[in-house]
Amino acid sequence: MKLEKLVGERFKERPADCVIDSHAIMVKGGYIKYMANGIYSSYLPLRRIVRKIEQILREEMDKIDGQEVQFPVVMPAAKMVLGMTHEEAAVHLVREYAQSYTKYPFMIYQIQTKFRDEARPRAGLIRVREFTMKDAYSFHTSQEDLEQYYEKCHAAYERIFERVGVPEVVSVKSDSGMMGGNISHEFMLLTPVGEDSIVLCDSCDYRANMEAAENISDIARDAESAALEKVYTPNVHTIEDVCNFFGDETKNSCKAVVYQQNVDDKYVVLFIRGDLEVNETKLVNFLGEQVHAAVITEECGLNAGYIGPVNLKVNGDAVVLYDKSLEGRNNLSCGANEAEHHYKGLDMERDVPNAEYHDFAKIQEGGICPKCGKKTVKISRGIEVGNIFQLGTKYTKSMNMT
């Protein structure tokens, strides 16, 4: 076909609404056309590229004994008519077939248009409401067999990205989130315009996304502990204000971050080192419940800006948690649970003897690598281009296949 006959407009100038280069190139070159927020039509040049990518996907899935199927887009559910993924449909498709152990293992896959009610579409095709996905589902009779096949899938994905020619794709340990299961990996394309934070180590091969990366604290306990002293601190509310008032660093403070559980509005008070941020994915996984930022009222008994672990009182049922960054620490500043008052000289072992500690913190640039122990952690940006999970029996058990 001659170029003059090719449907679609091509432009010399960069479109003003294109923030990143890839979006601008596709619009300028006549690959896509904007229809609505997060929704694009594609012209012939892009369709040819997509078909080639799909062929690579099929070849690599077939190499590991995958069988291509097609699930319906519409699901028999009142609230979720359009299927986000098809775990339930996959179990439904093979449940009667897989009655004998001789049928296992096997894998089915499809390439299909997916839909997301995306709240913030952005950057052309990077975050959209409609896109093409290859999703695969494997079935096994043992955990050992699942783990062996998982490695085959991991290798297949690496071959796919190599054949497609995508540069700098790294496999990182990830949180399974709503998908369930215990083990998962994301394949991340490293790019400054990426939305996800990726934890890399310059000294070893450790890779993880921010949600799954363990935070390790190495701040030692002081040789001597000062006495716990309540201090009048007028107009001091934030952790930065507190540390400035006492002339100390934020790493030597204990701050409270308060949430409420979505299911029952129960308060969750989390104490963490003052210079760290809460990794809310870790918190949700620990609680088994979704949370939101708390609305602190007079009735709850908490004194916003002055919450501390000593003599903490919350009206009603509440969950009180402590991050590992506070374990063994002493000579800290914290809230005194009284307006315009803070403590200095907090010793966690002495003043909060029954505290149990868990990892709820985000790892920081230059932090300690969980694998090699060196302070060579680097935080990069990336775009998720693939994901694999070990889901276990979450779906097969709930649908009476096991």
Predicted regions, residues:
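TRNA-binding/sensing appendages of the translation machinery
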Residues: 1-77, 132, 137-177, 275-276
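Conserved oxyanion/phosphate-binding beta-strand-loop segments in alpha/beta enzyme cores
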Residues: 1-34, 65, 103-128, 386-387, ...
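Pocket-edge structural micro-motifs
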Residues: 36, 43-44, 83-84, 113, ...
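Hydrophobic alpha-helical hairpins/lids featuring a short glycine-rich hinge
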Residues: 78-113
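Extended, low-hydrophobicity, polar/charged segments
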Residues: 87-95, 120, 125-136, 144-402
